Design a protein with these regions (language model features):
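Left-handed beta-helix
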Residues: 1-163
Length: 163
């Protein structure tokens, strides 16, 4: 495990290494668990926290890979989401963070999810409260998570209908 509070800092202290602190004001979150990683991404959607991506004094520099802008098709619907370049939405996405080149097909529904780069969500698939890893394909009609559950689901491999 590589958790700062549970592993790295105690090991450094046991090894007699020097540790230094830096007082930081603003948003910070340890994302060492699935739940905290999901929460940090959902914080992007919450305008009432210290994480303000619209602040012109707090620039975020990233590698800008040439790609098409995101596209919401005629059957697509997006509510309260962050959408990265190259994403194509023909289904319905709500309260989610969609990374680059995500593809959500027609009649698919995504809610409170974090879809990492290159995720493909098949026609009629449903995703609830999940983190879907880079490059994963969710097959047509597959269901991930439950709208009635508080549990965060981590998907790191292809999901077929009925799994």
């Amino acid at each position: 495990s590589h958790d700062f509070g549970k592993d790295i800092i105690p090991t450094m202290l046991n090894d007699g290494k020097s540790l230094y602190a830096y007082k930081f004001k603003g948003y910070w979150k340890d994302v060492g668990t699935i739940d905290s990683l999901w929460e940090a991404n959902m914080d992007l959607l919450n305008k009432n926290n210290e994480l303000n991506l619209d602040d012109p004094n707090w620039k975020i520099y990233t590698e800008d890979i040439p790609t098409l802008p995101h596209y919401v098709g005629p059957t697509g619907k997006v509510e309260h989401c962050y959408i990265n370049q190259g994403a194509v939405i023909r289904g319905h996405a709500v309260d989610s963070v969609l990374f680059n080149n995500v593809d959500i097909d027609e009649d698919a529904f995504v809610s409170q999810a974090v879809l990492m780069p290159n995720v493909k969500v098949g026609k009629g698939a449903k995703i609830y409260r999940a983190i879907v890893a880079d490059g994963v394909k969710i097959d047509d009609g597959a269901v991930v998570g439950s709208p009635d559950s508080e549990e965060i689901v981590l998907i790191s491999k292809r999901v077929k209908k009925g799994e």
